[in-house]
Amino acid sequence: MTKKWTALLLAAVLAVGLSACDTSRAEAPGSNLESGVSAIEDAMTKRNETESSSFPAGSDLRIGTSADTVATPDDFPAAYNYGTGKIEDYSRTAMLQKMPEPVDNATVLNTSADPNHIQALYLWEEGNVPAKTQFTAAMTGYFDNWDFRPYVTAIPVRTGVQPKGAVVLMAGGAYQFRGNYTDSLPTAAALRELGFQTFIVDYRLSPYTQEEGALDVARAVRFVRQNADAYGIDPDDIAVMGFSAGGIQAGEFLMHYDEDVNGTALDESYVPDALDAVPAHASAAGMIYSFYGRLSVGNMDPDWLAEGDLPPTFYVYGTEDPFYRQFRQQYDVIRNMGISTGRIVLNGWPHGFGPDGGWVNDYAAWLESVFANKEES
Protein backbone atom coordinates (compact mmCIF):
# COMPACT_ATOMS: atom_id res chain seq x y z
CA MET A 1 0.00 0.00 0.00
CA THR A 2 1.40 3.41 -0.96
CA LYS A 3 2.11 6.15 1.56
CA LYS A 4 -0.81 8.19 0.25
CA TRP A 5 -3.39 5.44 0.58
CA THR A 6 -2.04 4.35 3.96
CA ALA A 7 -2.60 7.94 5.01
CA LEU A 8 -6.08 8.01 3.56
CA LEU A 9 -7.10 4.93 5.51
CA LEU A 10 -5.36 5.71 8.79
CA ALA A 11 -4.02 9.22 9.24
CA ALA A 12 -7.25 10.74 8.01
CA VAL A 13 -8.81 10.13 11.40
CA LEU A 14 -7.04 13.28 12.56
CA ALA A 15 -9.71 15.22 10.70
CA VAL A 16 -12.31 13.16 12.53
CA GLY A 17 -15.61 13.74 10.91
CA LEU A 18 -15.28 17.38 10.02
CA SER A 19 -18.65 17.03 8.35
CA ALA A 20 -20.06 14.37 10.65
CA CYS A 21 -19.22 15.90 14.02
CA ASP A 22 -20.45 19.48 14.06
CA THR A 23 -19.85 21.11 17.45
CA SER A 24 -23.28 22.70 17.32
CA ARG A 25 -24.58 19.30 18.45
CA ALA A 26 -23.33 19.68 22.00
CA GLU A 27 -26.06 17.41 23.28
CA ALA A 28 -25.28 14.54 20.89
CA PRO A 29 -24.48 11.21 22.56
CA GLY A 30 -20.89 10.25 23.24
CA SER A 31 -21.14 7.49 20.66
CA ASN A 32 -20.30 10.23 18.14
CA LEU A 33 -16.65 9.51 18.97
CA GLU A 34 -16.73 6.11 17.27
CA SER A 35 -19.18 7.08 14.55
CA GLY A 36 -17.11 10.16 13.75
CA VAL A 37 -13.89 8.16 13.49
CA SER A 38 -15.54 5.58 11.25
CA ALA A 39 -17.17 8.21 9.08
CA ILE A 40 -13.96 10.04 8.42
CA GLU A 41 -12.07 6.81 7.70
CA ASP A 42 -14.62 6.08 5.00
CA ALA A 43 -14.78 9.62 3.67
CA MET A 44 -11.05 10.10 3.45
CA THR A 45 -10.59 7.21 1.02
CA LYS A 46 -12.39 9.29 -1.60
CA ARG A 47 -10.08 11.27 -3.84
CA ASN A 48 -10.41 15.02 -3.84
CA GLU A 49 -11.17 16.76 -7.12
CA THR A 50 -8.14 19.06 -7.18
CA GLU A 51 -6.56 21.19 -9.82
CA SER A 52 -3.02 20.59 -8.57
CA SER A 53 -1.74 20.27 -12.14
CA SER A 54 -2.73 23.89 -12.76
CA PHE A 55 -1.41 25.19 -9.45
CA PRO A 56 0.32 28.57 -9.92
CA ALA A 57 4.04 28.30 -10.56
CA GLY A 58 6.21 28.94 -7.53
CA SER A 59 7.81 27.32 -4.52
CA ASP A 60 4.59 26.68 -2.56
CA LEU A 61 3.78 23.37 -4.26
CA ARG A 62 6.09 20.44 -3.57
CA ILE A 63 6.15 16.67 -3.65
CA GLY A 64 6.70 16.20 0.08
CA THR A 65 9.33 14.11 1.82
CA SER A 66 9.91 12.27 5.09
CA ALA A 67 13.64 13.02 5.11
CA ASP A 68 13.41 15.62 7.88
CA THR A 69 10.66 13.97 9.96
CA VAL A 70 11.85 13.58 13.57
CA ALA A 71 11.43 10.28 15.45
CA THR A 72 10.89 10.28 19.22
CA PRO A 73 13.90 12.08 20.77
CA ASP A 74 16.23 9.95 22.89
CA ASP A 75 15.59 12.02 26.01
CA PHE A 76 11.78 11.76 25.94
CA PRO A 77 10.19 9.69 28.74
CA ALA A 78 8.58 6.46 27.52
CA ALA A 79 5.08 7.89 27.97
CA TYR A 80 5.83 10.43 25.23
CA ASN A 81 7.06 7.91 22.66
CA TYR A 82 5.19 8.60 19.43
CA GLY A 83 7.34 6.47 17.11
CA THR A 84 8.79 7.71 13.83
CA GLY A 85 6.42 10.60 13.19
CA LYS A 86 5.93 9.39 9.61
CA ILE A 87 2.48 9.17 8.08
CA GLU A 88 2.97 5.55 6.98
CA ASP A 89 3.34 4.42 10.61
CA TYR A 90 0.13 5.98 11.92
CA SER A 91 -2.55 3.84 13.54
CA ARG A 92 -5.93 4.37 15.14
CA THR A 93 -4.42 3.36 18.51
CA ALA A 94 -1.80 6.09 18.26
CA MET A 95 -4.33 8.66 17.14
CA LEU A 96 -6.52 8.01 20.16
CA GLN A 97 -3.68 7.84 22.70
CA LYS A 98 -3.91 10.35 25.54
CA MET A 99 -1.08 12.48 26.90
CA PRO A 100 -0.05 11.97 30.56
CA GLU A 101 -2.06 14.22 32.87
CA PRO A 102 -0.55 16.45 35.57
CA VAL A 103 0.16 14.91 38.96
CA ASP A 104 -0.62 16.19 42.46
CA ASN A 105 -2.99 18.90 41.18
CA ALA A 106 -0.07 20.83 39.65
CA THR A 107 -1.42 23.94 37.93
CA VAL A 108 -0.05 26.89 36.00
CA LEU A 109 -0.62 29.00 39.13
CA ASN A 110 0.67 26.80 41.95
CA THR A 111 3.71 25.31 40.20
CA SER A 112 6.90 26.96 38.95
CA ALA A 113 7.78 26.51 35.29
CA ASP A 114 10.55 23.95 34.73
CA PRO A 115 12.55 24.86 31.59
CA ASN A 116 14.64 21.69 31.80
CA HIS A 117 12.02 18.93 31.79
CA ILE A 118 8.73 17.99 30.17
CA GLN A 119 6.05 19.30 32.49
CA ALA A 120 2.25 18.86 32.50
CA LEU A 121 0.15 21.45 34.33
CA TYR A 122 -3.59 21.98 34.69
CA LEU A 123 -4.63 25.26 33.11
CA TRP A 124 -7.31 26.17 35.63
CA GLU A 125 -7.59 25.98 39.38
CA GLU A 126 -9.91 23.27 40.66
CA GLY A 127 -13.47 24.58 40.94
CA ASN A 128 -12.75 27.69 38.86
CA VAL A 129 -12.93 26.53 35.24
CA PRO A 130 -14.99 28.90 33.07
CA ALA A 131 -17.71 26.99 31.22
CA LYS A 132 -21.19 27.32 29.80
CA THR A 133 -21.69 23.62 29.06
CA GLN A 134 -22.99 21.26 31.72
CA PHE A 135 -20.98 18.03 31.37
CA THR A 136 -22.17 15.52 33.97
CA ALA A 137 -21.18 12.03 35.09
CA ALA A 138 -24.29 10.67 33.40
CA MET A 139 -22.95 11.76 30.00
CA THR A 140 -20.71 8.89 28.92
CA GLY A 141 -18.95 7.77 25.77
CA TYR A 142 -16.95 10.92 25.13
CA PHE A 143 -13.18 10.99 24.69
CA ASP A 144 -12.78 12.77 28.03
CA ASN A 145 -14.62 12.03 31.26
CA TRP A 146 -17.00 14.58 32.71
CA ASP A 147 -14.38 15.72 35.26
CA PHE A 148 -11.67 16.36 32.66
CA ARG A 149 -9.53 19.44 33.36
CA PRO A 150 -7.70 21.09 30.45
CA TYR A 151 -3.92 21.07 30.73
CA VAL A 152 -0.75 22.14 28.98
CA THR A 153 2.38 20.07 28.44
CA ALA A 154 5.62 22.05 28.17
CA ILE A 155 8.34 20.44 26.06
CA PRO A 156 11.45 22.61 26.42
CA VAL A 157 14.49 22.76 24.17
CA ARG A 158 17.51 20.63 24.97
CA THR A 159 19.86 21.94 27.66
CA GLY A 160 22.28 24.51 26.29
CA VAL A 161 20.13 25.48 23.30
CA GLN A 162 19.30 29.17 22.90
CA PRO A 163 15.50 29.34 22.38
CA LYS A 164 14.20 31.16 19.33
CA GLY A 165 10.67 31.59 20.65
CA ALA A 166 7.67 29.50 21.68
CA VAL A 167 4.96 27.60 19.84
CA VAL A 168 1.63 26.60 21.42
CA LEU A 169 0.15 23.57 19.62
CA MET A 170 -3.35 22.08 19.40
CA ALA A 171 -4.04 18.63 17.96
CA GLY A 172 -6.84 17.80 15.54
CA GLY A 173 -9.79 15.48 16.03
CA ALA A 174 -12.94 17.48 15.13
CA TYR A 175 -13.60 18.08 18.83
CA GLN A 176 -14.20 14.35 19.30
CA PHE A 177 -10.61 13.50 20.33
CA ARG A 178 -7.12 15.01 20.30
CA GLY A 179 -4.57 13.34 18.02
CA ASN A 180 -1.55 14.39 20.04
CA TYR A 181 0.60 11.38 19.21
CA THR A 182 0.09 11.77 15.48
CA ASP A 183 0.40 15.52 14.98
CA SER A 184 1.09 17.90 17.89
CA LEU A 185 3.60 15.80 19.86
CA PRO A 186 5.86 14.79 16.93
CA THR A 187 5.65 18.33 15.56
CA ALA A 188 6.56 19.77 18.96
CA ALA A 189 9.56 17.42 19.03
CA ALA A 190 10.66 18.62 15.59
CA LEU A 191 10.27 22.30 16.50
CA ARG A 192 12.11 21.68 19.75
CA GLU A 193 15.09 20.31 17.80
CA LEU A 194 14.99 23.54 15.78
CA GLY A 195 15.21 25.69 18.92
CA PHE A 196 11.60 26.43 19.85
CA GLN A 197 10.04 25.99 23.27
CA THR A 198 6.83 24.05 22.66
CA PHE A 199 3.57 23.73 24.58
CA ILE A 200 0.79 21.27 23.77
CA VAL A 201 -2.72 22.21 24.90
CA ASP A 202 -5.18 19.47 25.83
CA TYR A 203 -8.20 21.69 25.28
CA ARG A 204 -11.83 20.81 25.93
CA LEU A 205 -13.65 18.66 23.39
CA SER A 206 -17.29 17.74 22.76
CA PRO A 207 -19.69 18.25 24.47
CA TYR A 208 -17.91 21.53 25.21
CA THR A 209 -17.94 24.28 22.60
CA GLN A 210 -15.29 25.84 20.42
CA GLU A 211 -15.51 28.95 22.58
CA GLU A 212 -14.70 27.09 25.79
CA GLY A 213 -11.69 25.50 24.13
CA ALA A 214 -10.50 28.92 23.00
CA LEU A 215 -10.29 30.00 26.63
CA ASP A 216 -8.01 27.01 27.26
CA VAL A 217 -5.71 28.17 24.46
CA ALA A 218 -5.69 31.71 25.86
CA ARG A 219 -4.81 30.38 29.30
CA ALA A 220 -1.85 28.45 27.89
CA VAL A 221 -0.59 31.52 26.04
CA ARG A 222 -0.82 33.54 29.25
CA PHE A 223 1.22 30.89 31.06
CA VAL A 224 3.95 31.03 28.43
CA ARG A 225 4.07 34.83 28.46
CA GLN A 226 4.17 34.97 32.25
CA ASN A 227 7.11 32.55 32.28
CA ALA A 228 8.96 33.98 29.29
CA ASP A 229 12.08 34.66 31.36
CA ALA A 230 12.17 31.11 32.71
CA TYR A 231 11.90 29.73 29.18
CA GLY A 232 14.47 32.19 27.84
CA ILE A 233 12.24 33.87 25.26
CA ASP A 234 10.90 37.29 24.37
CA PRO A 235 7.29 37.36 25.70
CA ASP A 236 6.14 38.55 22.28
CA ASP A 237 7.79 35.65 20.44
CA ILE A 238 4.87 33.26 20.84
CA ALA A 239 2.98 31.52 18.05
CA VAL A 240 -0.16 29.39 18.13
CA MET A 241 -0.66 26.59 15.65
CA GLY A 242 -3.13 23.78 15.21
CA PHE A 243 -3.96 20.80 13.07
CA SER A 244 -7.42 20.50 11.53
CA ALA A 245 -9.85 21.21 14.40
CA GLY A 246 -6.88 22.34 16.48
CA GLY A 247 -6.19 25.07 13.93
CA ILE A 248 -9.83 26.12 14.03
CA GLN A 249 -9.42 26.28 17.80
CA ALA A 250 -6.34 28.48 17.44
CA GLY A 251 -8.33 30.69 15.09
CA GLU A 252 -11.22 31.00 17.54
CA PHE A 253 -8.74 32.14 20.17
CA LEU A 254 -7.20 34.74 17.85
CA MET A 255 -10.56 36.00 16.59
CA HIS A 256 -12.40 36.35 19.90
CA TYR A 257 -10.50 35.31 23.03
CA ASP A 258 -7.00 36.77 22.91
CA GLU A 259 -5.41 39.77 24.62
CA ASP A 260 -7.48 40.87 27.67
CA VAL A 261 -10.52 38.58 27.26
CA ASN A 262 -10.87 36.20 30.22
CA GLY A 263 -13.22 33.50 31.45
CA THR A 264 -15.96 35.94 32.42
CA ALA A 265 -16.68 36.38 28.71
CA LEU A 266 -18.44 32.99 28.82
CA ASP A 267 -19.05 32.35 32.49
CA GLU A 268 -20.08 35.12 34.89
CA SER A 269 -19.29 32.87 37.85
CA TYR A 270 -15.63 32.61 36.88
CA VAL A 271 -13.31 34.41 39.30
CA PRO A 272 -10.34 36.02 37.51
CA ASP A 273 -6.94 35.28 39.04
CA ALA A 274 -3.40 36.63 38.73
CA LEU A 275 -2.76 34.96 35.38
CA ASP A 276 -5.68 36.80 33.81
CA ALA A 277 -3.72 40.03 34.16
CA VAL A 278 -1.28 38.73 31.52
CA PRO A 279 -2.38 39.55 27.94
CA ALA A 280 -3.02 36.45 25.84
CA HIS A 281 -1.07 37.71 22.84
CA ALA A 282 0.31 35.62 19.97
CA SER A 283 2.46 37.07 17.20
CA ALA A 284 1.96 34.32 14.60
CA ALA A 285 -0.38 31.50 13.65
CA GLY A 286 0.00 28.13 11.94
CA MET A 287 -2.96 26.57 10.11
CA ILE A 288 -1.96 22.98 9.40
CA TYR A 289 -4.67 21.55 7.13
CA SER A 290 -6.95 24.05 8.81
CA PHE A 291 -8.49 27.50 8.49
CA TYR A 292 -10.16 30.34 10.38
CA GLY A 293 -13.82 29.46 10.77
CA ARG A 294 -15.80 26.56 12.16
CA LEU A 295 -15.84 22.81 11.64
CA SER A 296 -15.98 22.05 7.89
CA VAL A 297 -16.42 25.70 6.92
CA GLY A 298 -13.61 28.20 6.44
CA ASN A 299 -14.71 31.83 6.66
CA MET A 300 -13.89 33.76 3.48
CA ASP A 301 -15.38 37.11 4.54
CA PRO A 302 -12.54 39.66 4.73
CA ASP A 303 -14.64 41.93 6.94
CA TRP A 304 -15.11 39.14 9.49
CA LEU A 305 -11.45 38.15 9.34
CA ALA A 306 -10.39 41.78 9.77
CA GLU A 307 -12.24 41.92 13.09
CA GLY A 308 -9.68 39.52 14.55
CA ASP A 309 -6.66 41.73 13.76
CA LEU A 310 -4.97 38.47 12.79
CA PRO A 311 -1.21 37.92 13.02
CA PRO A 312 0.99 36.54 10.22
CA THR A 313 -0.37 33.12 9.28
CA PHE A 314 1.30 30.04 7.76
CA TYR A 315 -0.79 27.45 5.89
CA VAL A 316 0.16 23.83 5.22
CA TYR A 317 -2.13 21.44 3.35
CA GLY A 318 -2.22 18.71 0.73
CA THR A 319 -3.88 18.72 -2.68
CA GLU A 320 -5.77 15.50 -1.83
CA ASP A 321 -7.43 17.06 1.21
CA PRO A 322 -11.25 17.28 0.91
CA PHE A 323 -10.94 20.89 2.12
CA TYR A 324 -8.19 21.78 -0.35
CA ARG A 325 -10.21 24.45 -2.15
CA GLN A 326 -11.21 26.12 1.12
CA PHE A 327 -7.61 26.24 2.34
CA ARG A 328 -6.49 27.70 -0.97
CA GLN A 329 -9.30 30.25 -1.07
CA GLN A 330 -8.77 31.49 2.48
CA TYR A 331 -5.03 31.78 1.95
CA ASP A 332 -5.72 34.07 -1.01
CA VAL A 333 -8.22 36.12 1.02
CA ILE A 334 -5.80 36.53 3.92
CA ARG A 335 -2.92 37.47 1.64
CA ASN A 336 -5.05 39.98 -0.28
CA MET A 337 -6.00 41.58 3.03
CA GLY A 338 -2.33 42.45 3.51
CA ILE A 339 -1.70 39.94 6.30
CA SER A 340 1.76 38.41 6.10
CA THR A 341 1.46 34.80 4.99
CA GLY A 342 3.46 31.67 4.31
CA ARG A 343 2.42 28.43 2.66
CA ILE A 344 3.49 24.89 1.83
CA VAL A 345 1.24 22.75 -0.39
CA LEU A 346 2.06 19.03 -0.60
CA ASN A 347 1.11 17.62 -3.98
CA GLY A 348 -0.85 14.37 -3.65
CA TRP A 349 -0.97 14.44 0.15
CA PRO A 350 -4.23 14.00 2.11
CA HIS A 351 -5.59 15.41 5.33
CA GLY A 352 -3.84 14.33 8.52
CA PHE A 353 -0.14 13.97 7.73
CA GLY A 354 1.08 15.54 10.97
CA PRO A 355 4.72 16.72 10.85
CA ASP A 356 5.51 14.55 7.82
CA GLY A 357 6.04 15.95 4.35
CA GLY A 358 9.05 18.20 4.95
CA TRP A 359 7.20 21.37 5.93
CA VAL A 360 8.32 21.88 9.56
CA ASN A 361 11.72 23.36 8.73
CA ASP A 362 10.10 25.90 6.40
CA TYR A 363 7.57 26.84 9.04
CA ALA A 364 10.33 27.28 11.63
CA ALA A 365 12.35 29.51 9.30
CA TRP A 366 9.25 31.58 8.52
CA LEU A 367 8.50 31.88 12.24
CA GLU A 368 12.01 33.14 12.96
CA SER A 369 11.52 35.80 10.32
CA VAL A 370 8.15 36.83 11.73
CA PHE A 371 9.55 37.13 15.25
CA ALA A 372 12.52 39.14 14.00
CA ASN A 373 10.28 41.55 12.10
CA LYS A 374 7.16 41.59 14.26
CA GLU A 375 7.35 45.33 14.85
CA GLU A 376 6.80 45.80 11.12
CA SER A 377 3.94 43.26 10.85
Regions found by a protein language model. Name each.
Residues G17-A20:
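C-terminal motif of bacterial Sec signal peptides marking the signal peptidase cleavage site
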Residues G58, G64, V70-V161:
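N-terminal cap/lid segment of alpha/beta-hydrolase-fold proteins
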Residues K164-G172:
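Short beta-strand element of the alpha/beta-hydrolase
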Residues G179-Y181, V201-G232, F353-G358:
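Catalytic nucleophile-loop/oxyanion-hole region of alpha/beta-hydrolase
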Residues Y181-F199:
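Short amphipathic alpha-helix adjacent to the substrate-entry channel of hydrolases
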Residues R219-G308:
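Primarily recognizes the serine-hydrolase "nucleophile elbow" in alpha/beta-hydrolase
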Residues Y315-Y317:
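Short beta-strand/loop motif that positions the catalytic acidic residue
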Residues R328-Y331, R335-S377:
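C-terminal catalytic histidine-bearing segment of alpha/beta-hydrolase fold enzymes
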